[in-house]
Curated annotation (Swiss-Prot):
It comes from the Archaea. Belongs to the ThiI family. InterPro entries: Rossmann-like_a/b/a_fold, ThiI_AANH, ThiI_fer, ThiI_N, THUMP_dom, THUMP_ThiI, tRNA_STrfase, tRNA_sulfurtransferase_ThiI. The gene is thiI. SUPFAM superfamilies: Adenine nucleotide alpha hydrolases-like, THUMP domain-like. This is Probable tRNA sulfurtransferase.
């Protein structure tokens, strides 16, 4: 089986050197996802050849950096008569009783135009069909002539677009396991980041089990990259926070998470922190509290969901398969029912100094898992 893979449009806009690096990363991610086959670059597309006709090429729809892909039949000929005869052989049964259109595309120098190909192939297929409609066909027939090769297909399967996972470096994700953090992780992967997962386990075995189920769903989108997970025992942090006024505990917990993520960035050479926060969704995510929460953190903090409402986030969670696990997870971060919407920075910093949390020790005592 031969497949034409079309990289995301923005990859083509990169400089030649960057484009080459992005495409090679994409090729590696495709190979890791499919598990084998011959793969190479060719004039702006990627060609994948697999021996097994039952290969799971549908998995390409979950490889970031792919705009679309098509299983194709290829012939080594750019002779117009050969092209028309092959089109008739392949597509006569497919257009039978249906309204169709032929779309042709050429790269290279030929003695005919793309319109010539469309007309001749259309004439050959017309007797088998219900008619031609170039605007609203039931079936589209595609013919691509690339120099001396010609490719025939009738399916264009959408990819997720974005950038290949790995081109943007690593980010530490504060992963609670609720609806938001898996979606934020997915969105950063779509921009080429490899996520390093930091989870504060505040709910015991059930929490851990559901988080791992969510991450197994996200693993499908990773382009074969391993997901490294640091699971912190959250009860120890809770004990520390019991010394803080109840209304300030949510923001203090977030501060502990951010500072631990900062330490993990240092250890893993990650260059950013990612969270699933959305502006004003809850009291700890007001602009004032986000300012307090991230104060003094030296790494950039990415919040891909900052402008999304809950309905939009849920739609993505359903699409990527994490929602069914997320809804089973209680909101463990809601440790105070009377949280302030605007914490006092100086008070928070004094509490932080008094608690004297050992972030290095938190990571040393964490459980590390690779998926």
């Amino acid at each position: 089986m031969l497949v034409i893979i079309r990289p995301s449009g923005e990859i083509a806009l990169k400089s030649p050197r960057s484009r080459r690096n992005f495409e090679y990363t994409l090729i590696n991610n495709i190979r890791n996802t499919i598990g084998g086959g011959k793969i190479w670059r060719s004039q702006g597309v990627i060609l994948l050849e697999v021996n097994d006709n039952n290969a799971n090429i549908e998995a390409l729809s979950e490889v970031f950096g792919i705009s679309s892909f098509s299983p194709v039949i290829a012939i080594k000929s750019n002779n117009l008569e050969d092209i028309v005869n092959k089109a008739k052989e392949i597509f006569a049964e497919i257009v039978k009783g249906k309204i169709f259109a032929v779309r042709a595309k050429r790269i290279g120098s030929h003695s005919f135009t793309s319109l010539d190909v469309e007309r001749r192939a259309g004439e050959a297929l017309y007797p088998y069909s219900k008619g031609v409609d170039l605007e609203n066909p039931e079936v589209e027939i595609f013919i691509e002539i690339r120099n001396e090769m010609t490719y025939f297909y009738h399916k264009v399967i959408k990819g997720p677009k974005g950038l290949p996972v790995g081109v943007a470096g690593k980010t530490v994700v504060l992963f609670s396991g609720g609806i938001d953090s898996p979606v934020a992780t997915w969105m950063m992967m779509k921009r080429g980041s490899v996520p390093i997962i930091l989870n504060f386990n505040l709910g015991g075995d059930l929490h851990k089990e559901l988080v791992l189920k969510e991450l197994n769903m996200l693993k499908r989108w990773s382009g074969g990259h391993k997901l490294k997970i640091f699971i912190v025992k959250g009860t120890d942090v809770f004990i520390k926070l019991s010394q803080v006024e109840r209304r300030s505990r949510v923001v203090m917990l977030k501060r502990v998470m951010y500072k631990t993520a900062e330490k993990l960035c240092e250890k893993t050479n990650a260059k950013s922190i990612t969270t699933g926060e959305s502006l004003s969704q809850v009291s700890s995510q007001t602009m004032a509290n986000l300012y307090v929460t991230e104060y003094g953190i030296k790494y950039p903090i990415f919040r891909p969901l900052i402008g999304f409402d809950k309905e939009e986030i849920v739609d993505i969670a359903r699409k990527i398969g994490t929602y069914k696990h997320s809804i089973k997870l209680p909101e463990y971060c809601a440790i105070s029912t009377k949280a302030r919407t605007s914490e006092d920075l100086n008070e928070i910093l004094k509490n932080e100094e008094r608690l004297n949390v050992d972030y290095e020790k938190i990571l040393e005592n964490s459980e590390v898992i690779e998926l």
